[in-house]
Amino acid sequence: MAAAAAAAAEQQSSNGPVKKSMREKAVERRSVNKEHNSNFKAGYIPIDEDRLHKTGLRGRKGNLAICVIILLFILAVINLIITLVIWAVIRIGPNGCDSMEFHESGLLRFKQVSDMGVIHPLYKSTVGGRRNENLVITGNNQPIVFQQGTTKLSVENNKTSITSDIGMQFFDPRTQNILFSTDYETHEFHLPSGVKSLNVQKASTERITSNATSDLNIKVDGRAIVRGNEGVFIMGKTIEFHMGGNMELKAENSIILNGSVMVSTTRLPSSSSGDQLGSGDWVRYKLCMCADGTLFKVQVTSQNMGCQISDNPCGNTH
């Protein structure tokens, strides 16, 4: 091939250009293209893509990553809403918080009207107002309740109630003088000045007295029970019992009425004179009194029956 090319070159140079056949031109063109393609693909090595190392999150890991991103986005939106609500309620501005102040001493001061549900002060904390200003606490159609342990103070529209299992005391904060106390062993129970009546469901005490210039009135809407472990002693200049129903006196030994005793019989039930003693289910008694004021009853078994019975408590004097 080299010799033929050299001979052709010598012939072309001596006799002028030599015409090539169609086959020779095609072979020459193919060789040129092959050489060109080999130069273009120099350093290129074809590799199968399936054999390459795959990077990134694919399959289940990709789905899990998408779920985590969505969850973080939801939490970010909730955090943004809470931040906006806190900012709107507390009113944080360029000059700080417009609704409250925090002091180094631990004092939290509210500078405007605040709407709260339940307040839990810390141990030995104090809730109060500013100097020379009133502390106004208002409940929206609900009672205001102050509670510590079992002690509770409830302020309502028409009443104020205090409930305590250990007692209570009211004292002047300036003079520290006790105005009212339920510690009966140390202080005698007195109604505060200006209080005219005391409404209780049950009271346990040694004695109940009134002032020397006023009467002691005990009034009940239903039934009143006065009971003493060692007897009941009622003393006064004048003792009056007014009842709309029945009055029942019970004693283990005797009932003693000292002084002048008057019983109004106008409202006492009585049977008509024409009724027979044995008719019906009624059992009749006659009220009798001894000279010393002792009352006793005698069952009526016959007409015109008196109090002279053999076992009367008066002895020989009726």
UniProtKB/Swiss-Prot annotation:
It is found in: Cell membrane, Sarcolemma; Cytoplasm, Cytoskeleton. Its main location: membrane. It holds the Pfam family Sarcoglycan_1. GO terms for biological process: cardiac muscle cell development; gene expression; glucose homeostasis; glucose import in response to insulin stimulus; muscle organ development; response to glucose; vascular associated smooth muscle cell development. Disulfide bonds are present. Coiled coil: none annotated. GO terms for cellular component: cytoskeleton; dystrophin-associated glycoprotein complex; endoplasmic reticulum membrane; Golgi membrane; plasma membrane; sarcoglycan complex; sarcolemma. Residues 1-32 are annotated as: Disordered. Glycans are attached at residues 158, 211, 258. It is a single-pass type II membrane protein. Residues 21-32 have a biased composition (Basic and acidic residues). Keywords: Cell membrane, Cytoplasm, Cytoskeleton, Disease variant, Disulfide bond, Glycoprotein, Limb-girdle muscular dystrophy, Membrane, Signal-anchor, Transmembrane, Transmembrane helix. Highest expression in heart and skeletal muscle. Low expression in brain, kidney, placenta, pancreas and lung. High expression in fetal brain. Also found in fetal lung, kidney and liver. Residues 1-65 are cytoplasmic. The keyword Transmembrane helix applies. PANTHER family: BETA-SARCOGLYCAN (PTHR21142:SF2), SARCOGLYCANS (PTHR21142). Component of the sarcoglycan complex, a subcomplex of the dystrophin-glycoprotein complex which forms a link between the F-actin cytoskeleton and the extracellular matrix. It is linked to Muscular dystrophy, limb-girdle, autosomal recessive 4: An autosomal recessive degenerative myopathy characterized by pelvic and shoulder muscle wasting, onset usually in childhood and variable progression rate. Belongs to the sarcoglycan beta/delta/gamma/zeta family. This is Beta-sarcoglycan. The gene is SGCB.
